[in-house]
Design a protein with these regions (language model features):
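Catalytic cores of soluble, metal-dependent hydrolases
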Residues: 1-47, 54-69, 126-130, 134-243
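Active-site glycine-rich loop that binds ribose-phosphate moieties when present
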Residues: 31, 55-58, 72, 79-83, ...
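Class I SAM-dependent methyltransferase core
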Residues: 48, 74
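Short acidic donor-binding/metal-coordinating loop in glycosyltransferase active sites
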Residues: 51, 77
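Conserved donor-binding loop and adjoining core beta-sheet/short helix segment
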Residues: 106
Length: 243
């Protein structure tokens, strides 16, 4: 529908999975970072299928070594800026707090869309804002097209390198029930496509789609949605020809 031809204009390859240690989170984070260090020795833009949102931290670490600080378009029900989670400094709910602390993000070029989780307080979102993030809570997205918002996003993130991170729980569980931390009142599938298509023209240096959980996805609809959104992300990568 967008006339994008990613397979006709890019060299696209599935390079397989990263063999993590499922019993040691910190070791897995190390393994992922080392794998992406090797991947990024080549002229590639990695588009990654998670896994939970922990994976984004080691990927951003590797990307920082090549591109420096990056802007971020982050779609999620949760801000993922906890200082600790289950007593741990590194977990799926702490990713972007650690990324800020480690200097991986250009904070004035970060946008978070769809935040709404019941477990958060206003202060949690305010922490993001004090860092320079543009925070778009879910209720700001209800009953409307997000095309105007994405014009603001493109202006915010500008011409520098940008990473796109899409947590499937940013979408309402009516469409994406197969995830570990579903939250009502989320984005629609159409809005998700508007967000991704609105990233066309950005200097995307990587992206991921995370938190699809097949054991919770009894109908397969969430996996289908995730696969389609990954394809939408592929269609907005730099170098894709539109015919």
């Amino acid at each position: 529908a967008t006339d994008a031809a990613p397979f006709g204009s890019l060299s696209v390859a599935d390079i397989g999975g990263v063999a993590i240690s499922t019993f040691n989170l910190l070791d897995s984070v190390r393994i992922i970072e080392e794998a992406y260090d090797e991947i990024l020795e080549h002229d590639v833009i990695p588009l990654t299928m998670g896994g939970d949102h922990t994976i984004t931290l080691p990927i951003l670490r590797a990307i920082h070594k090549k591109h420096g600080k990056v802007g971020l378009v982050h779609i999620d029900a949760h801000a993922d800026v906890n200082d600790h989670m289950f007593g741990e400094k590194i977990a799926h709910g702490t990713t972007f707090r650690r990324a800020v602390e480690e200097g991986l993000l250009d904070c004035d070029r970060v946008v978070q869309i769809g935040l709404r989780a019941q477990g958060y307080t206003a202060e949690d979102f305010n922490w993001c804002r004090t860092q320079g993030f543009r925070v778009v809570q879910a209720e700001e997205c209800w009953h409307k097209s997000l095309a105007p918002l994405m014009a603001e996003v493109r202006e915010k993130v500008g011409n520098g390198p940008v990473y796109l991170s899409f947590d499937i729980d940013g979408i309402d569980p009516a469409w994406a029930p197969g995830t570990g931390t579903p939250e009502i009142g989320g984005l629609t599938t159409i809005q998700a496509m508007e967000i991704i298509r609105g990233c066309q023209g950005l200097d995307l240096v990587g992206g991921d789609l995370v938190e699809v959980s097949p054991p919770y996805d009894t109908t397969g609809n969430t996996s289908l949605l995730g696969a389609n959104l990954l394809y939408e992300m592929l269609c907005v990568m730099p170098g894709v020809v539109h015919r």
